[in-house]
C-alpha cells in the first residue's frame, strides 16, 4: 500500500554550560577592615578560556515506512548515528589549592551514539463501529565515549576508565 524512504543529515553546534565561559567570572563580598573601614572584597571564581568553541554534532538518520493490506500492518524503522566532537569538559588535572580556582573547561571530548528504532502496528476494523489496534516498539542505542581526559590512574584500571560505552567501560581499539 505505502512505501516511504527517509534520509537526513545535519550538523549543529551547542555551547554547553555558561554562555560566557570565554570570560573570567568574579565574585564580590566578604568585607574586610582596612583602618577601621569595611571594604568589599573581590575574587576570581573561574578563569575564562578564550579558546573554547562550540561543541559540534554531525547527525545521520535513515528510515523506512511501509504498510500492506490497506494499512492493516505497518512498519516504521530508523537507523541513527551521531558523532559529537569538541565536547566541553573539565581538564583531568590536579592544581594546588593555592591556585584558588578550578580550571576552566576545554574542548576535549568526543563521543558517538548509534541505534535503531522499530515500530510495528496492526489495525483491523471489525464491523462498522469497532476496531482492534496493537502497536509494538523496540529501541536499541549505544553511546561510546571516544575521547576524554584520561590519566594513568584511570587508563590502567579497567574499572575506572572513562572511555568506552556509557553503560560499562572498556577501551576502544582504534
Question: What are the roles of these predicted feature ranges?
Answer:
Residues 169-174:
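Conserved small/polar residues in nucleotide/adenosyl-binding loops
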